[in-house]
Amino acid sequence: MKVVEIFDSIQGEGEYMGTMCTFVRFAGCNLSCPFCDEAKKYGKAKEMTIEKIVKKCEQKIVVLTGGEPTIQPQLEELVKALQAAHHHVHLETNGTNDIDYFIEWITVSPKAPKYECKCLYNEVKLVVSEDLTLEQALAHTCGQLVWLQPCDGPWLEQSKKTILKWIEKYPDLFRAGIQLHKYYNAR
């Protein structure tokens, strides 16, 4: 499997924010989002066996992230091996690939309105940028809680104002999120 890094840190986003986890970051993605810096930011991947990955996971919760984890051919086998080792598996995905096996928690972060979500999920995380409209955000609710996170960069202040406005208008559909790990200077 193509792994960029494995590390322990607090979950900085969503329902499990503040929980200690082991993160397994995979390389590669099936999308080509213009704003993505995944390859530049995280560097080169190394091939790792499922056994080596499982051995490096020390926390109860293991978060599979990326890039896009669902493009890894052996993902289902890794999930089952982690579960057999008594880990709770969480997946962070763009949602464009089918998942037909059990994962304890799935967070979908759709990257553009043109991509259709093909998996069942527990929560949605949307980065509120100048390109995201309220109508697009509402289309992702589908009965699940949607976490709205501000966009870093020059649009940050406007992003925070937009989030507050949307939550005020739809308090049962949206929650404000942050990247808590950045606040604590954690990875």
Identify the function of each model-found stretch.
Residues 4-10, 14, 34, 60-63, ...:
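Generic alpha-helix detector with strongest preference for long hydrophobic helices that associate
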Residues 5, 20-21, 32-103:
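Conserved Radical SAM active-site core
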